[in-house]
Amino acid sequence: MQQPARTKYRKQQKGRNKGIATRGAKVSFGEYGLKAVGRGRLTARQIEAARRAMTRHIKRGGRIWIRIFPDKPISHKPAEVRMGNGKGNPEYFVAEIQPGKVLYEMDGVDEVLARQAFRLAAAKLPILTTFVVRQVGG
């Protein structure tokens, strides 16, 4: 699972996830990509589960790039703890996803296999996604 090696601050405010992705919106490394249509948060576990599903399906063929990184800590207070007494401890990390963001890329496999692999990966993710092909010269 991915997580930052170290962070400047242990905890972050919740914030808002507005707008559409302008950076990371094109297929840059591979030939095919899995692009987010919806918005939301992906936990490090979900990112890893989708990666495993794709890797198992393509069986050593091709190469996969993960274009997102879970860099936002999410804190939780323990169960049955009274309100107050500060913010809870960081429990896991998430990546904030806007519509248009390319999540994964793949190369070295044919399109049919890539579509099947991305469909398996998309089933592991809580947001809507679509299959995209790299645009030549653009």
UniProtKB/Swiss-Prot annotation:
Signal peptide (from-to): none
State a GO cellular component annotated for this protein. cytosolic large ribosomal subunit
Q: Where is the composition biased (Basic residues)?
A: 7-17
Q: Where are the transmembrane segments?
A: none
Q: What molecular functions are annotated in GO for this chain?
A: rRNA binding; structural constituent of ribosome; tRNA binding
Gene3D superfamilies named in the record: Ribosomal protein L10e/L16
Protein keywords: Ribonucleoprotein, Ribosomal protein, RNA-binding, rRNA-binding, tRNA-binding
Q: Which domain of life is it from?
A: Bacteria
Where are the stretches annotated Disordered? 1-22
Biological process (GO), any one: translation
NCBIfam families, per this entry? rplP_bact
Listed under subunit, the entry gives: Part of the 50S ribosomal subunit.
Q: What does this protein do?
A: Binds 23S rRNA and is also seen to make contacts with the A and possibly P site tRNAs.
Q: Which PANTHER family match?
A: 50S/60S RIBOSOMAL PROTEIN L16 (PTHR12220), LARGE RIBOSOMAL SUBUNIT PROTEIN UL16M (PTHR12220:SF13)
**Which HAMAP family would you find in this protein's record?**
Ribosomal_uL16 (MF_01342)
Q: What family is it from? A: Belongs to the universal ribosomal protein uL16 family.
Instruction: Please state what the protein is called.
Output: Large ribosomal subunit protein uL16
Supply the source organism for this entry. Answer: Nitrosospira multiformis (strain ATCC 25196 / NCIMB 11849 / C 71)
